[in-house]
Amino acid sequence: MILMRAPIVEVFSSIQGEGLLVGRRQIFVRFAGCNLNCSYCDTPESRDPSAGRLFTAPELTEIIEGLITPDFHSISITGGEPLLYPDFITELLEESPHRTLLETNGSLPSNAERIAHLFDYASVDIKIAEHFSDNLRSGTTESDISSPGDLIDREIQVINILISRGVNTYCKVVVMPTTGAGYIGALAERLLECVDEPERLPLVIQPCSPPEQWAQNTPRLLEMSQEAGKYMDVYVIPQMHRALGLR
């Protein structure tokens, strides 16, 4: 039998520094290849599929099991964009006894439909227009996304798929000092209107790194939180692993 292989940039154990599982010890499996071209990406090396080493699912499972510590909480399937590899992820996780987190840009609803049942938690990264300084599509991975509007429609589809499958889901939006509070409020209002069960979807506002650029802009974060809070349960959580010097 020929085993599937997928390009993996790295597998490592660390503390989750983002979102609602912040502080949890996780084993991170970072897939190579991404279909988007976000200006703030903190792992640009993972955009190119050729950047990863090819692994089979049994090879990855052996590495994961060797990294488990007494404080281990869950496996984070991240990237890049892991939804590019639904068949491989199915092979990797369908027999796994461990809790799992999917970290995704939410751009591939049909693939999310195929593997949502494999996850306990999901973080869907909502993209806004200012995240893309040029073309929103990655030049290294094929994509048929036509515009930021098309992208957010897909992200909402993925959120609804995950919630309907019982996955503990939150959405995250990375903000910059230039991001308007009204824009974030309008985004939260749209999520309230379009998500099937919005009461099950918290919104995490994540200030982009480095944190020093926010020294004179903390009132803006409070304004964003206040505007989003009119519609959703909202958190403001920076990248804690960056502050601690962790991966």
Swiss-Prot record:
Catalytic reaction list: 6-carboxy-5,6,7,8-tetrahydropterin + H(+) = 7-carboxy-7-deazaguanine + NH4(+)
Keyword check for Iron: yes
Binding site for substrate: 15-17, 30, 78
CC cofactor: [4Fe-4S] cluster; S-adenosyl-L-methionine; Mg(2+)
GO molecular function: 4 iron, 4 sulfur cluster binding; carbon-nitrogen lyase activity; magnesium ion binding; S-adenosyl-L-methionine binding
Pathway membership, UniProt: Purine metabolism; 7-cyano-7-deazaguanine biosynthesis
Cofactor binding summary note: Binds 1 [4Fe-4S] cluster. The cluster is coordinated with 3 cysteines and an exchangeable S-adenosyl-L-methionine.
Transmembrane segments: none
UniProt: [4Fe-4S] cluster binding residues: 34, 38, 41
InterPro entries with a match to the protein in the record: 7-CO-7-deazaguanine_synth-like, Aldolase_TIM, rSAM
EC id: 4.3.99.3
Top-level taxon in the UniProt lineage: Archaea
Binding site for S-adenosyl-L-methionine: 80
Radical SAM core domain span: 21-247
Pfam families: Fer4_12, Radical_SAM
Keywords: 4Fe-4S, Iron, Iron-sulfur, Lyase, Magnesium, Metal-binding, S-adenosyl-L-methionine
UniProt-annotated binding residues for Mg(2+): 43
UniProt similarity note: Belongs to the radical SAM superfamily. 7-carboxy-7-deazaguanine synthase family.
Quaternary assembly: Homodimer.
Function: Catalyzes the complex heterocyclic radical-mediated conversion of 6-carboxy-5,6,7,8-tetrahydropterin (CPH4) to 7-carboxy-7-deazaguanine (CDG), a step common to the biosynthetic pathways of all 7-deazapurine-containing compounds.
Protein known as: 7-carboxy-7-deazaguanine synthase
